[in-house]
């Protein structure tokens, strides 16, 4: 079902289910023979959500070779390594920020992110998580049931990012006068282009000098290329649906002419360094994801680390 302006979701439907899919990939990466990451909360969270397709994938009952369309450029087999190196990128970002003295972090569209529970945060650290109310409530309750305890002062902010989240964040105790480490992981593609710009504007307005931002950006592409990407994704997920997958990924994202993230942030006073997914995979000794001449795929995603200097 296509997105609407005021749509909502839980972790089994729409955009929320993509968070469960990513957590499933993290669980598989964690259980690998030589794991690049250790997220012990990923698998129990996926099991608790209860989407059969993702549970079978995590347990190995789903054979990805039977599911994947190798010509589409979107394969389940590629996701554990891709999500592992993505996770390491954002983990390292937070570690670098705290070593620099930052004591306030904001995780935008936090989904099933368990960093507040699994990273070694310094004393005096406050972590804010922002997401849909149903998503926040589910994760908080499930992790409490697992006996998990946050390793920082965790403050959840149950608000849609299309609403007045800056006020909700401030009401939760956010200090705009202190440097902040922000992450927007797997978020921009699910925002309209103008909403992406507005999000970056709001982050900047709330950020003191020395604040840091890490984000995942989708390269801009002409409409024709976007349509090809959507068709390739539909081709891939058609095979998945034969095995119980119920999402239409092609309907979840937003197309349109997007600002170049690094240039947009530069105009706002941020200095950015970008790394492509292919480089992250190579740096971590993981198998490459082939580029697709007809479309943008995971291989083309860019990860930016930015510092506010203004």
Swiss-Prot record:
Statement: the UniProt record of this protein carries the keyword S-adenosyl-L-methionine: yes
Class of the enzyme per the UniProt entry, highest EC level: transferase
Biological processes, Gene Ontology terms: methylation
EC number: 2.1.1.-
Pfam families (alphabetical): LCM
Transmembrane segments: none
Residues annotated as binding S-adenosyl-L-methionine: 131, 160-161
InterPro entries: Ppm1/Ppm2/Tcmp, SAM-dependent_MTases_sf, SAM_mthyl_Trfase_ML2640-like
Highest taxon of the lineage: Bacteria
GO molecular function per UniProt: methyltransferase activity
SUPFAM superfamilies: S-adenosyl-L-methionine-dependent methyltransferases
Keywords (A to Z) from UniProt: Methyltransferase, S-adenosyl-L-methionine, Transferase
PANTHER family, sorted: S-ADENOSYL-L-METHIONINE-DEPENDENT METHYLTRANSFERASE YKTD-RELATED (PTHR43619), S-ADENOSYL-L-METHIONINE-DEPENDENT METHYLTRANSFERASES SUPERFAMILY PROTEIN (PTHR43619:SF2)
Purpose: Exhibits S-adenosyl-L-methionine-dependent methyltransferase activity.
Protein family: Belongs to the UPF0677 family.
Name recorded for this polypeptide: Putative S-adenosyl-L-methionine-dependent methyltransferase MMAR_3534
Species this chain originates from: Mycobacterium marinum (strain ATCC BAA-535 / M)
């Amino acid at each position: 079902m296509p997105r609407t302006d005021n749509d909502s979701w839980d972790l089994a439907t729409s955009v929320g289910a993509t968070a469960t899919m990513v957590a499933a990939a993290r669980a598989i990466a964690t259980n690998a023979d030589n794991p690049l990451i250790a997220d012990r909360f990923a698998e129990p969270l996926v099991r608790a959500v209860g989407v059969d397709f993702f549970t079978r994938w995590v347990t190995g009952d789903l054979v990805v070779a039977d599911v994947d369309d190798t010509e589409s450029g979107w394969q389940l087999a590629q996701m554990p390594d891709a999500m592992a190196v993505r996770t390491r990128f954002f983990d390292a970002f937070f570690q670098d920020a705290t070593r620099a003295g930052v004591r306030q972090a904001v995780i935008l569209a936090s989904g099933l992110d368990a960093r507040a529970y699994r990273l070694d945060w310094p004393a005096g650290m406050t972590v804010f998580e922002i997401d849909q109310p149903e998503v926040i409530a589910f994760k908080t309750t499930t992790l409490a049931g697992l006996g998990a305890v946050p390793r920082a002062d965790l403050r959840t902010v149950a608000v849609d990012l299309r609403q007045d989240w800056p006020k909700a964040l401030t009401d939760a105790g956010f200090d705009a006068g202190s440097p902040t480490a922000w992450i927007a992981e797997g978020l921009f593609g699910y925002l309209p282009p103008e909403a992406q710009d507005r999000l970056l504007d709001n982050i900047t307005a709330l950020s003191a000098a020395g604040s840091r931002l890490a984000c995942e950006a989708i390269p801009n592409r002409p409409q024709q290329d976007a349509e090809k990407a959507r068709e390739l994704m539909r081709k891939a997920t058609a095979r998945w649906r034969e095995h119980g997958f119920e999402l239409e990924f092609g309907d979840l994202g937003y197309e349109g002419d997007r600002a170049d993230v690094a240039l947009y942030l530069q105009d706002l006073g941020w200095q950015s360094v970008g790394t492509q997914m292919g480089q992250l995979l190579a740096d971590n000794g993981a198998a490459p994801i082939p580029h697709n001449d007809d479309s943008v795929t995971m291989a083309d995603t860019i990860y930016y680390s930015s510092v506010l200097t203004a």
